[in-house]
Amino acid sequence: MFGGKGGMGNLMKQAQMMQDKMAKVQEEIARTEMTGEAGAGLVKVTMTGNHNVRKVEIDPSLMEDDKEMLEDLIAAACNDAARRIEENQKTKMAEVTGGMQLPPGMKMPF
């Protein structure tokens, strides 16, 4: 079933190697920072791979404008940064899993 003697042990070894690689990639993802933008770059939000906002940059010209518009742009920049983080995570995990797809709704890291 597992290719004879040592087959199961070899399978377990491969699973452990993959788990180790995934742990390293997850650490790398957590350290990664992505910047999302809104309003043609007037609002920028930098977020870590753990979805923690590290920095918000607002162009001074927006300080005179409508408060609601500024709030909308900040939210849009946060969403853009989160989307970029998700795309980066998918790419990094696909490298580890050899493109093996996760079931719908299952996110990395577990």
Curated annotation (Swiss-Prot):
Main location: cytoplasm
Function according to Swiss-Prot or TrEMBL: Binds to DNA and alters its conformation. May be involved in regulation of gene expression, nucleoid organization and DNA protection.
UniProt superkingdom: Bacteria
Single Gene Ontology MF annotation: DNA binding
Locations listed in the record: Cytoplasm, Nucleoid
Family: Belongs to the YbaB/EbfC family.
InterPro entries according to UniProt: YbaB-like_sf, YbaB/EbfC
Protein name per UniProt: Nucleoid-associated protein Sfri_2406
Keywords assigned: Cytoplasm, DNA-binding
One Pfam family from the record: YbaB_DNA_bd
Subunit annotation: Homodimer.
An annotated GO cellular component: cytosol
